[in-house]
A protein has these predicted regions:
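Amphipathic alpha-helical segments used for helix-helix packing
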Residues: 22-40
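Hydrophobic alpha-helical connector segments
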Residues: 1-22, 65, 75-78
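Short alpha-helical scaffolding segments that buttress acidic/His motifs in well-ordered protein cores
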Residues: 13-16, 30-34, 78, 82-85
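A general structural signal marking secondary-structure boundaries and capping sites
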Residues: 2, 20-24, 41, 89, ...
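Hydrophobic/aromatic-rich alpha-helical bundle segments in the mid-to-C-terminal region
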Residues: 44-51, 64-112
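Amphipathic alpha-helical packing segments from all-alpha helical-bundle domains
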Residues: 3, 7-10, 40-65, 103
Length: 113
C-alpha cells in the first residue's frame, strides 16, 4: 500500500511510540551525548549535527512532497516537535506522548498547505 508524504511523516510518530514502548528506550543517543558533555567538546556536537542533517534532509524531502508552502520552516517545526516528543517520553516514561506529537504534527502539516 502506497502512503502519501503526509501519512509517511505522521507514521514517524507511530514508530516513535513503538520505540518508546521498547525495554531498550533510553532516549536519543545524540541528544543524550550532547546533554551529558561539555559544550566545548565539539566533536560530539559535530557527530550529532551530522546525524541531524541527514535526518533533516530526508524529512524535508517528505515535507516538500506533501505540498507544504515553506518546506524548510515546516521541517524545522517538525524537528523541534520530534526532539521534544523524544525528550518528554524519556522524562515521563509515557509513550502516549507520541500520539500527542502525531496530532501536533498533523496540525503543522495542515497549516502549511
Amino acid at each position: 500500500m502506497e502512503c502519501s508524504p503526509t501519512e509517511r511523516i505522521l507514521a514517524l510518530f507511530d514508530l516513535m511510540r513503538d520505540w518508546f514502548d521498547s525495554k531498550n528506550f533510553y532516549g536519543c543517543v545524540f541528544i543524550n551525548a550532547v546533554a551529558e558533555h561539555e559544550k566545548s567538546n565539539g566533536w560530539i556536537q559535530e557527530v550529532a549535527n551530522s546525524h541531524r542533517e541527514k535526518i533533516t534532509a530526508k524529512l524535508q524531502a517528505m515535507v516538500a512532497a506533501s505540498g507544504a508552502q515553506d518546506p524548510e520552516m515546516v521541517t524545522e517545526k517538525l524537528n523541534l516537535l520530534i526532539d521534544g516528543t523524544i525528550v518528554t517520553a524519556m522524562v515521563t516514561a509515557n509513550s502516549e506522548i507520541a500520539h500527542i506529537g502525531k496530532l501536533a504534527a498533523g496540525d503543522i502539516l495542515r497549516n502549511a498547505q
